């Protein structure tokens, strides 16, 4: 089987037969209950057919195995593992009214990078967290103290991945849901700076980004700096050529917090314009926990 958007595509291979044939695949939960079904239709002489299971995220993530109806033996059963779980991603911009503005909106590049690979959700923080969610991305969005901070802290502690992007708002109002304390914003190559824009260093071993090629054309013109500390080095997943952090991360409870020290737009860097941006986000989503479906849904 392979995933494609909200679909699970299953291929059936057989020896050729002289007449058209049909077969049925049944998706079952770990308790054996049927959750969905689809049909293969093969023409006379065909050796291969495909069935498509259209599954909402909460149901798809409960599928434990696929059975070929009426058949027995190992060739008629496929067990699904974590790779086939859908990972819903919530998006929260710093400014909702301009979030989708082409080229400059907080979510413009994020949505284009992730839409082909993840189920994206947009809503308030409260409503996003009311449903099972693997990843929540905050684009230059400080967290309000009180109920919102408590809810996001609980989301991370219970296994969620919180990805944050820096910006002027976060630099001005940092909060406690960051992997490292922030010090200040640094501008590179500006009229008041003698420093030139920085390139990216190779990703360190042990980073989820290790092995990804670093494009020479990506440069960083502004970033938020981290407070120096004894544990800073172990929390850096990506650096600039001068050694300062580009991405930091920290485990909290069962989950983790990841911070890009630049914006999710091209205002502070060329990173969102590059294919590397897509690859980095895909690796972070793949690191997250697939959500479990809710009980009570029956046959589709």
Where in this protein do the model-derived segments appear?
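N-linked glycosylation sequons
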Residues: 1-300
């Amino acid at each position: 089987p392979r995933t494609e958007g909200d679909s699970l595509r299953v291929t059936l291979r057989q020896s050729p037969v002289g007449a058209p044939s049909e077969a049925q695949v049944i998706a079952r939960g770990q308790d054996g209950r049927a959750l969905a079904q689809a049909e293969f239709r093969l023409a006379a002489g065909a050796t291969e057919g495909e069935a498509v299971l259209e599954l909402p995220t909460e149901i798809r993530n409960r599928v434990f195995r696929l059975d070929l109806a009426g058949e027995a033996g190992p060739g008629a059963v496929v067990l699904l593992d974590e790779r086939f779980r859908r990972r819903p991603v919530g998006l929260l911009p710093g400014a909702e009214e301009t979030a989708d503005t082409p080229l400059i909106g907080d979510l413009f590049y994020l949505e284009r990078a992730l839409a082909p690979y993840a189920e994206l959700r947009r809503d308030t923080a409260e409503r996003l967290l009311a449903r099972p969610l693997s990843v929540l991305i905050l684009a230059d969005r400080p967290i309000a103290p009180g109920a919102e901070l408590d809810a996001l802290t609980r989301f991370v502690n219970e296994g969620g991945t919180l990805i944050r992007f820096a910006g002027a708002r976060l630099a001005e109002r940092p909060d406690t849901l960051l992997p490292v304390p922030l010090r200040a914003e640094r501008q590179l190559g500006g009229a008041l700076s003698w420093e030139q824009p920085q390139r990216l260093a190779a990703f360190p071993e042990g980073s989820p980004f290790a092995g990804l090629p670093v494009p020479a054309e990506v440069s960083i013109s502004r970033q938020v700096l981290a407070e120096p500390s004894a544990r800073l080095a172990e929390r850096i997943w990506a650096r600039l050529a001068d050694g300062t952090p580009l991405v930091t991360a920290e485990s909290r409870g069962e989950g983790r917090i990841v911070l890009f020290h630049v914006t999710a737009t091209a205002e502070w860097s060329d990173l969102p314009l590059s294919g590397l941006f897509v690859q980095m986000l895909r690796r972070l989503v793949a690191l997250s926990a697939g959500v479990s479906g809710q009980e009570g849904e029956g046959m589709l």
